[in-house]
C-alpha cells in the first residue's frame, strides 16, 4: 500500500451538521497524506526520474499531498468520488451540486443543493500540483526531488508569457505558480521569442533588450525568478523564454498521488478516515485535471502497487483531445498552450495511424494490456473544439472519417457552451488569463448535463446500464464542419465580428528530441505538419447542431458559441479569448434595430407568447431527461 501515513489537521461537522437524504450528517476532514512508493515496483516503472529520487530505509520514495474529505459521519458511504483539484482549487462539489460558479479559490465549500451528499458520495479533494502556493484555499503537494550521482540536475525549460496589458516584469512561471529559477541571471545562453498569434512564426528578441530581473520602485535588479523588458511585453502577443533551470522534481509523482489516494480510500488502507471500504471509486477532473486523467490512462496507472484496479469510472471534463505536462523533467503542470509533451500523439482512445510517421497507437493501449481499464465518459464544451484539439479524439488524423469509441467509452459535446459554466445576468468581464472578450460571455450553465454524465457513469459501472450514445460532431452526418465554414455563416447571417481563422489554435506534429522516452526535451520544440481541426456545424442562427442541446440551444433566445473575439484593449483583436464563448441575443421584436447582416428572426417571430416558449422549453428538457442526457 503506497499510503504510509496521514496527518489530520482539522475534523468538523460539515455545513453545521446538515442531514443529507438517507445518509445523515457529513463531516469535513482536512489533512495531509504521506505516500511511499517503491521505485522498483513495475506499477511505477513509467514515472520519469523516479529511480533518481532518494529513498528511505524501506527503499521507498516519499511525498505528500493536501486533502479535504467530505464523508457521512454516521452511515456507510455509497461510493467514492476523487476530486482532482484544478490548480489547487476544489471543483467537484460546486460542479455537481450547482453552487454558485466562481473562479475565486476559497477554503469554504458551498454545499449547493446537496446533489452528491443526498446520494451518499464520499468526496475527497486531493492536492497533486507541486508548484501551487499552498494555502487554506489551494491544495498542493510536496514532491520528491531528482538527484543523480549527488550532482545538481540541470536542463532546458520554457516559460510562456501572455500579457493582457502592457507590463515590464513577468514571473518566470506559468500563471502565478512557483517558478523554476534560472541557473544564472546572465541571459547570453537563454533566448526570448515572440509570436503574434498561436501558430505564428517565432521571432527572437535580442538579449540586449531583456534580462532576468524585476523592477521594484523604479529600480531594476537581477532576479532568477523574473524576466524584465524595458520596452514592455505587449498585450496580445505571446512570448517564450528558453533558459537553463535546475533541481527538478519527479513530476510524475502527481499521477501516483491520484492513483494512490483512490486506492487508499477504496480499500481502506493505513489510517483511512473512511473505515469501511467502498466498493466503487470514481475520478473527476476538469480542464487541466481532465487532461491529467487522460495522461493517467495513457500511462497505464489504474492498477496500484498490489495490482488492484483503482478507479472503476473516470470522468475527464473539458479535456479535449490532449494530455499535459505531467510526467517529464522540468514539467509545468499548468502549462497547456505551448507545444510540448501535452500536444503529442495519440489523441484518440482507439488506435489510429499518425500520418506523420509514428506507429498506430491509442490512448488506452497500455491500460488495456495491463488490465484495470475503467469505464470512461468524456464531456467537452464547444471551446475545446475551437481551440483545435477535441475533434482529434474521434476523427482520424487525415480528417477523412469518424473513429468509433471503444466499448468502455462515451463522449459528449455540450452544444454551444464555453469552457466553464456561467450564470445570469450576463457578464462581459475578464477571462481566465485576464483578457477581455469583445462580446458578453456565454450564459449557459451546462452542469445539469454534467450531473447526468456522472449518474450514467455510476449506472454503467454499478448496474451494467449502458449510457446513451456518444454525441459529438461527425463527418458521416455532416454535423462536423471546418472553422472557415462556420465563421462564414456568422459573417453572413449573424452580423458578429469574427476572428481570423488563420490565427486560431491548432495542433501540429512535433519533435521534442531524441530523449523523449526519458522525459527530456529541447525548446522550442520543432513543429511540423498540421492535424485537422473540426468543430460543430451550425444552423442559420449560428447555434451548433452537434452534441447534446440544452433548451438554450434547441429553443433559443440567442446565439451561443464556444469562442469570443478578443477586445481590442487586450491586443490581438483578430484572435479569440482563451476558453470563453459568447451569447448574443436575438432581437426581441421584428422592428428592433439590429446590426448589419443580422438575419436572425426576432423572438416575436419565433414564439407566439411566453407561454408557448416555456412549453417548448419544458418539452425539450423532458426529452433530454428521457434520453438520460439531462
What is the predicted function of each stretch?
Residues 2-630:
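C-terminal His-loop and adjacent cap/lid subdomain of alpha/beta-hydrolase
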Amino acid at each position: 500500500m503506497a499510503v504510509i501515513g496521514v496527518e489530520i489537521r482539522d475534523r468538523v461537522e460539515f455545513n453545521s451538521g446538515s442531514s443529507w437524504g438517507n445518509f445523515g450528517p457529513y463531516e469535513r476532514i482536512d489533512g495531509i497524506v504521506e505516500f511511499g512508493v517503491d521505485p522498483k515496483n513495475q506499477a511505477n516503472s513509467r514515472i520519469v526520474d523516479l529511480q533518481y529520487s532518494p529513498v528511505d530505509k524501506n527503499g521507498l520514495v516519499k511525498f505528500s499531498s493536501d486533502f479535504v474529505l467530505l464523508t457521512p459521519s454516521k452511515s456507510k458511504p455509497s461510493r467514492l468520488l476523487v476530486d482532482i483539484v484544478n490548480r489547487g482549487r476544489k471543483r467537484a462539489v460546486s460542479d455537481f451540486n450547482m453552487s454558485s460558479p466562481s473562479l475565486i479559490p476559497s477554503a469554504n465549500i458551498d454545499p449547493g443543493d446537496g446533489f452528491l451528499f443526498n446520494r451518499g458520495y464520499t468526496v475527497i479533494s486531493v492536492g497533486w500540483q507541486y508548484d501551487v502556493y499552498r494555502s487554506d484555499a489551494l491544495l498542493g503537494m510536496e514532491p520528491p526531488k531528482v538527484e543523480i550521482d549527488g550532482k545538481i540536475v540541470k536542463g532546458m525549460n520554457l516559460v510562456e508569457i501572455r500579457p493582457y496589458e502592457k507590463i515590464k516584469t513577468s514571473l518566470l512561471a506559468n500563471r502565478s505558480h512557483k517558478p523554476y529559477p534560472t541557473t544564472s541571471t546572465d541571459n547570453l545562453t537563454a533566448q526570448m521569442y515572440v509570436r503574434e498569434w498561436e501558430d505564428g512564426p517565432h521571432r527572437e528578441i535580442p538579449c540586449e533588450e531583456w534580462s532576468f530581473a524585476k523592477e521594484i520602485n523604479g529600480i531594476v535588479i537581477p532576479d532568477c525568478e523574473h524576466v524584465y523588458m524595458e520596452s514592455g511585453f505587449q498585450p496580445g502577443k505571446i512570448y517564450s523564454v528558453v533558459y537553463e533551470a535546475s533541481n527538478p522534481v519527479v513530476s510524475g509523482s502527481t499521477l501516483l498521488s491520484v492513483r494512490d489516494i483512490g486506492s487508499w480510500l477504496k480499500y481502506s488502507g493505513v489510517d483511512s478516515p473512511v473505515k469501511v471500504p467502498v466498493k466503487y471509486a470514481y475520478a473527476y477532473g476538469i480542464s487541466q485535471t481532465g487532461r491529467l486523467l487522460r495522461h493517467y490512462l495513457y500511462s497505464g496507472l489504474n492498477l496500484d502497487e498490489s495490482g488492484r484496479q483503482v478507479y472503476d469510472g473516470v470522468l475527464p471534463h473539458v479535456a479535449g483531445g490532449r494530455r499535459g505536462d505531467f510526467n517529464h523533467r522540468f514539467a509545468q503542470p499548468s502549462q497547456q498552450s505551448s507545444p510540448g509533451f501535452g500536444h503529442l500523439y495519440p489523441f484518440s482512445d482507439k488506435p489510429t495511424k499518425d500520418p506523420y510517421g509514428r506507429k498506430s497507437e491509442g490512448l488506452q493501449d497500455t491500460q488495456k494490456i495491463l488490465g484495470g481499464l475503467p469505464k470512461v465518459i468524456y464531456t467537452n464544451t464547444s471551446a475545446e473544439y475551437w481551440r483545435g484539439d477535441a475533434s482529434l479524439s474521434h476523427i482520424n488524423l487525415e480528417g477523412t472519417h469518424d473513429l468509433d469509441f471503444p466499448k468502455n467509452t462515451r463522449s459528449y459535446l455540450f452544444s454551444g457552451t464555453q469552457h466553464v459554466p456561467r450564470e445570469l445576468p450576463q457578464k462581459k468581464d475578464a477571462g481566465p488569463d485576464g483578457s477581455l472578450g469583445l462580446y458578453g460571455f456565454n450564459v449557459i450553465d451546462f452542469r445539469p448535463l454534467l450531473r447526468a454524465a456522472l449518474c450514467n457513469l455510476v449506472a454503467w459501472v454499478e448496474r451494467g446500464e449502458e449510457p446513451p450514445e456518444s454525441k459529438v460532431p461527425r463527418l458521416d452526418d455532416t454535423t462536423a464542419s471546418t472553422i472557415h465554414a462556420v465563421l462564414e455563416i456568422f459573417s453572413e447571417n449573424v452580423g458578429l465580428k469574427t476572428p481570423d481563422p488563420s490565427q486560431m489554435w491548432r495542433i501540429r506534429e512535433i519533435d521534442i528530441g531524441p530523449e523523449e522516452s526519458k522525459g527530456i526535451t529541447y525548446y522550442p520544440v520543432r513543429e511540423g505538419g498540421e492535424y485537422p481541426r473540426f468543430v460543430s456545424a451550425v444552423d442559420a442562427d449560428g447555434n451548433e447542431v452537434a452534441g447534446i442541446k440544452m433548451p438554450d440551444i434547441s429553443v433559443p433566445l440567442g446565439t451561443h458559441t464556444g469562442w469570443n473575439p478578443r477586445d481590442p484593449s487586450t491586443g490581438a483583436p483578430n484572435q479569440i479569448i482563451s476558453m470563453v464563448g459568447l451569447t448574443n441575443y436575438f432581437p426581441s421584436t421584428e422592428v428592433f434595430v439590429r446590426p448589419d447582416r443580422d438575419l436572425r428572426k426576432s423572438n416575436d417571430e419565433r414564439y407566439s407568447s411566453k407561454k408557448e416558449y416555456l412549453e417548448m422549453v419544458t418539452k425539450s428538457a423532458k426529452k433530454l431527461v428521457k434520453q438520460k442526457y439531462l
